[in-house]
Amino acid sequence: MAAAAAIAAALLRRSTSSQHHRRILLLPLLSHLQRAAPRSPSPWDPPPHHRFFFSSDVTAEGDSKPRPPLDGKQLWREVSTSEPATGASRLPKATWDAVVALLRRFGKDPAMSDQALALYIPASAFPTYARRFRHFLPARLSLESAEHLLSLPADDAHALLLPAFAEFCVTHLADELRKHESVMAAADLTAPHAWYPFARAMRRRVVYHCGPTNSGKTHNALTRFAAAKSGVYCSPLRLLAMEVFDKVNALGVYCSLRTGQEIKEVPFSNHVACTIEMLSTEEPYEVAVVDEIQMMADPVRGYAWTRAVLGLKADEIHLCGDPSVLKIVRKICADTGDDLEVHQYERFKPLVVEAKTLLGDLKNVRSGDCIVAFSRREIFEVKLAIEKFTKHKCCVIYGALPPETRRQQAKLFNEQDNEYDVLVASDAVGMGLNLNIRRVVFYSLAKYNGDRMVPVAASQVKQIAGRAGRRGSIYPDGLTTTFLLDDLDYLIQCLQQPFEEAKKVGLFPCFEQVESFAIQFPDLTFNELLDKFRENCRVDSTYFMCHQESIKKVANMLERIQGLSLKDRYNFCFAPVNIRDPKAMYHLLRFATNYSQSRRVSIAMGMPKGSAKNDTELLDLETKHQVLSMYLWLSHHFEEDHFPHVQKAEEMSINIADLLAKSLAKASWKPTSRQQAKPRRENEEDNDVEQASDDNAKNDSEDGYERSISRIKPFMRKRLDRPSQDPSSLNFVA
């Protein structure tokens, strides 16, 4: 905090100087300069090879006297009062080069760039200002001070330079700082708890239900929700909101449903089940339940959970999830003045790791198994192989399926009076569905992240594995294992790890904040405006700005359309569209174009004649449902007159979901992709594996489907840095 205080003092002196008559540039710096500058031990004891920096401190016998460390104020005083060296430098060439190298590293240090925001220096401008500082400092620096700087660890040296850098900017760049001031003030995302004055006027009771899957935490919160006079349930998924809506109404409690695509207002209801983005922070409630609270740290959607925690007008707020964001919730409650209670939960029955894997052969699948694969292609390959080489029938669940189809597949799997006794699913199975799973089998523990194959995060492995076993089902005991023996060690390693503590949670500006910022840049496109906002926004150490890649891609596509207001563009960019699906993007562009021309937006999409006969037709059904879902979402976010075919879209959506369910029941074809094939593996071996999977007809044998190469094993060479739990805390079965 010494650096923060020094910068504050620098700004205050300059702003009150009678010579400059500058208006105050001072910010609440302590909120922005969170990281205290590391301090050297006192008294200062230089390293042995720099023992004799200061000739005045060296005695005739060669003993050095302790000298207090140079601080930022002394450094600035020295360089600001000395003239730049002319002719021969006052520093030896080696020392000069080392100081310049240090200043280059200072200009590339993200921590210094973050702290420079307190001076109204945006991240994009920091390298330029740091370069000017680099040209200014070395010629004025004494040998003693230079050697002192070079003797320090990098972080300490940067912290010592920061106050001098601040003084330099305020002295020499004040006019430029003033230009940045109004821009950065409009992009100020600090102290977000102050955005909700009505919530701050309340002293809320926050109850954190902390525990793993299958521990009863959400059940207890929902019991309190149903018993309250009024309440809201905030879900991460439309599917989960629909499930709570059905259950609560079945209990005789009137409850409405609000999702982006569907709004059902039940007469006389004081309860509502909604998706987290559809939460109203204007309505008062007695009880609110926010599910999967750990999603606050999600890099894309985390802002919605943060908004709920900060803005809910509820006397009682129940947060359900794992402990990863508990520390941050404590800090937020301290900022908001709310009371926090923590209720700890354990699984009803421990999750057991089955040491005997499937040994790379899907013939070892058993009833009640859920095979988890991390790509649509693998899901259908596994389903095809299981149904070809065993007596089992498979249900399928993955993210691109409509919620209605996923519910139908889950119901089919849960029922005991049919032949569908195996589930093949993606990570979408990790939340939102109650499933009678006996054993979770990881087909792979590596996934494609859009660039390369990476290990599945330990937290995600825990979430998915925890779906095995459910209280009250025919499989109360949960088992988990892997398809390949080589993957088992990584599974065990993930389950042993404690939950990783989140460092920050997400924020994203509301439309009013973007609108206020846009006044500063009337000539920028919306895409450029988003870039400029991110570049200039300031957040404190508890928060981060959520990623906006999908929003920016949509914004870029819509730039060619004339006649859209800023708010129109903002809303269209949040529409639920799969940016990797060209057909879905085309329809969004068409919707926006028609809207901009004040024309009624048509669906312009025919109803399929029947269920899919191949994977191309199945993909087309998925896309059609996504387009209809997007149409319904837009109808709730724009005036109804512009989207008049809501009833038709709802009917088509239901019919297509039914066709998808019928298509999945008879799916027995080789999977394809929405786009042309892209390289998805890191080495030739993996490519060979994928080719082998594609050519099932060539590789099928009486021995069944096999994949003998582990995709996680190469990553196992790198040990995870986080400490593991005692292995005795895990349960194993042969």
Swiss-Prot record:
CDD domains xrefs: DEXQc_Suv3, SF2_C_suv3
Database matches in PROSITE patterns: HELICASE_ATP_BIND_1, HELICASE_CTER
Compartmental location: Nucleus; Mitochondrion matrix; Mitochondrion matrix, Mitochondrion nucleoid
Highest rank taxon of the organism: Eukaryota
GO molecular function, one term: RNA helicase activity
Any GO CC annotation of this UniProt entry: mitochondrial degradosome
Primary location: nucleus
Gene3D superfamilies (alphabetical): 1.20.272.40, 1.20.58.1080, P-loop containing nucleotide triphosphate hydrolases
Stretches with biased composition (Polar residues): 725-734
Basic and acidic residues biased stretches: 62-76, 695-709
Entry binding sites for ATP: G211, P212, T213, N214, S215, G216, K217, T218
Domain spans labelled Helicase ATP-binding: 198-356
Record's catalysed reaction(s): ATP + H2O = ADP + phosphate + H(+)
Family from the record: Belongs to the helicase family.
Quaternary assembly: Homodimer; in free form. Component of the mitochondrial degradosome (mtEXO) complex which is a heteropentamer containing 2 copies of SUPV3L1 and 3 copies of PNPT1.
Function: Major helicase player in mitochondrial RNA metabolism. Component of the mitochondrial degradosome (mtEXO) complex, that degrades 3' overhang double-stranded RNA with a 3'-to-5' directionality in an ATP-dependent manner. ATPase and ATP-dependent multisubstrate helicase, able to unwind double-stranded (ds) DNA and RNA, and RNA/DNA heteroduplexes in the 5'-to-3' direction. Plays a role in the RNA surveillance system in mitochondria; regulates the stability of mature mRNAs, the removal of aberrantly formed mRNAs and the rapid degradation of non coding processing intermediates.
Protein name stated in the entry: ATP-dependent RNA helicase SUV3L, mitochondrial
